[in-house]
């Protein structure tokens, strides 16, 4: 059994959340021992979503209107998958994404449809806007007010610059269970001050999340760029012919070529793991059967990345 989780990638400041990543690994590991791969993914991602330091669930970034629109997806190695985009007032979007996979014939539900689906299944209303999120919004609005133009124009002019320097705190988990089955899941609050209705890579299978018989992947970073490159699927398919780490490095090289800030975690069906970023630093942790406890690597940018 193997589990690896991530808490986002940043070119600048990253949250000190290694304790949460370790707890996510342990929660996922417990589920793996009792159930199957998809349960390990869901339980691990729920821990990450519940931490206000990370941009998912309770810590999700508000959009331009001050509303929190969240997205998530989950996928198994038999191509079963489900996702939600633009969902509001839900504590754990990853659980709704799993419900889409298991209880509908659809792959992706968005906006009001996703909200209605969640309520019909009994998911309780939950306000994910915590004190930390409010402070983040206040800082962004105050900075925008100092500009000569409107906040809308400010967003349009500064969005790409902001993307390159901010913490892109998508969270995700990838697992291999005791029966050799793989699964992956990704959850996010999107980009701080994004336009209402914007959807990134996280809920899109093949872009932010991917799993098949050879490997599984979860992405983080600049969603638009990840979508254009279809990175999760590429990395997943490359694992048929190389190690998980080699596949991730190949994906990051492609991202660098096109100027896309991103990171990835991956698990191959032989139990090998891979993680890396195109630039900046991605926070992650992993746990394998031959380890005493989860490890949260303290790698910094440009350090040597040997095969794992």
Language-model features: locations:
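Alpha/propeptide regions of enzymes that mature by internal proteolysis
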Residues: 1-308
């Amino acid at each position: 059994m193997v589990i690896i989780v991530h808490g986002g990638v940043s070119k600048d400041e990253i949250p000190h959340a290694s304790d949460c990543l370790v707890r996510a690994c342990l929660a996922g590991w417990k589920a793996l021992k009792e159930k199957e791969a998809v349960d390990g993914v869901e339980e691990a991602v729920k821990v990450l979503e519940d931490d206000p330091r990370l941009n998912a669930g309770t810590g999700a970034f508000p959009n331009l209107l001050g509303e929190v629109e969240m997205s998530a997806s989950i996928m198994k190695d038999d191509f079963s998958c489900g996702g939600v985009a633009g969902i509001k007032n839900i504590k754990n979007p990853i659980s709704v994404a799993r419900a889409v996979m298991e209880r509908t014939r659809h792959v992706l539900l968005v906006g009001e449809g996703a909200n209605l689906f969640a309520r019909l299944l009994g998911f309780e209303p939950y306000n994910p806007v915590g004190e930390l999120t409010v402070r983040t919004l206040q800082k962004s609005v105050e900075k925008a007010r100092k500009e000569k133009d409107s906040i809308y124009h400010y967003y349009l002019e500064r969005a790409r610059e902001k993307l390159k320097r901010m913490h892109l705190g998508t969270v995700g988990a990838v697992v291999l269970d005791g029966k050799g089955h793989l699964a992956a899941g990704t959850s996010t609050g999107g980009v701080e001050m994004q336009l209402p209705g914007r959807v990134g890579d996280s809920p899109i299978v093949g872009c932010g999340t991917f799993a098949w018989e050879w490997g599984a992947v979860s992405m983080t970073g600049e969603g638009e760029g990840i979508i254009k490159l279809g990175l999760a699927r590429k990395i997943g398919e490359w694992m048929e012919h190389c190690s998980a780490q080699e596949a991730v490095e190949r994906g990051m090289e492609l991202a660098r070529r096109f100027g896309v800030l991103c990171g990835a975690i991956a698990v191959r069906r032989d139990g090998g793991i891979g993680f890396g970023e195109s630039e900046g630093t991605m926070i992650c942790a992993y746990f394998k059967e031959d380890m005493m406890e989860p490890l949260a690597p303290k790698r910094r940018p440009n350090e040597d990345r040997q095969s794992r």
